[in-house]
Each structure stands twice: as structure tokens, then as C-alpha cells.
């Protein structure tokens, strides 16, 4: 379901508990484990999409998709996701704010978005998806089934991500501290300004 704030997604996977594969990792790391992912074509026309994945254990993955199947993990969005083991398998929940995604301008707030869902079962090394779009076909993003959303008018957003890091050099017996921040300002749903102060590309998310 969705609200003016964002898109909410949950899934419950039935699977024998002894077959579950849970591995922790840093963000955006592709590791063989159970996973569920959701791709959202906010353009509604197959121009671009965002993908979000939650692995069993809670590690997150995300990025963008360009036509037709150009996946990238260079984009990281401020969204929430969690997983949990259950008696019959495992479950996933996601909260995806509209404000982090580019949405075409709409006076009424009504839009069509494309949705694609994929599940990975690591124990048998298989993926299942809806809709079933074979990798041998050229069309992918443009074939996402459309869902109409109404009354979505995300407000202007200013997002601030500070960071601090510290490193120790055991050879020189020295320490280094760094601090900085990333700033995101979205005045409209189709425009975003991004800035960084003293960026540390090795900082831990």
C-alpha cells in the first residue's frame, strides 16, 4: 500500500527453516543468500526505475535501472528495510519514501508506476519473479506491469547525512579523524540538488 509519504511493501516467504541461508555483509554486496527485491518504475513509461532488496539477515541493497536492463548500485537512498525469520520461513518489510525518487510532474498527483518483484532462494540457487521476464528477452523495464497511484504530491525535502570516521595506522602509530556531510535538496519531484562537504568515499554507512 502507499500514502503521501511513501510506498510500503511486505512479503512472507514460506520455506523450510533448515533451507534458509542468512549471510551478513556491507550494503550493496551481492552474496549468495535468500533475498527479496522490489523494482519501481516511477516514470511509468520504462525510462528509469529504482530497485530495493532486503536480504535475510537485514543487509540492504539498492540502486537504479535504465532501459532495458542496466542495473547500477551506485545510488543509495534513505529507505528502511528489515527481515525476520518466522515459523514457516521468513518475512520482509520495506518503507520507500517518494521524496527520494524522481516522479514526473502531475497536477492531480495521479500517476502510473511499474512494479517488478523478485525472490532469490539460495539453497536451490533459483530466482522467481513477477512478472516472469526471461533474461533472454530484450524488453525488461518497459514491461513492468503498471499500478495507478493517486493523490501523491511529495513535499519539498532537505536531507542531511553527517558522518565521522577514525582510522589507526599501526605502523606509524598515528590516528586520523574525519568529518563531513552530504546534503540533498529536492524542491520538486523531478529535480534534486546534491552537495558534499569534505567527502570521505570510504565512510561506513
Task: Give each language-model segment a name.
Residues 1-205:
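Structural preference for beta-rich elements and adjacent junctions enriched in aromatics
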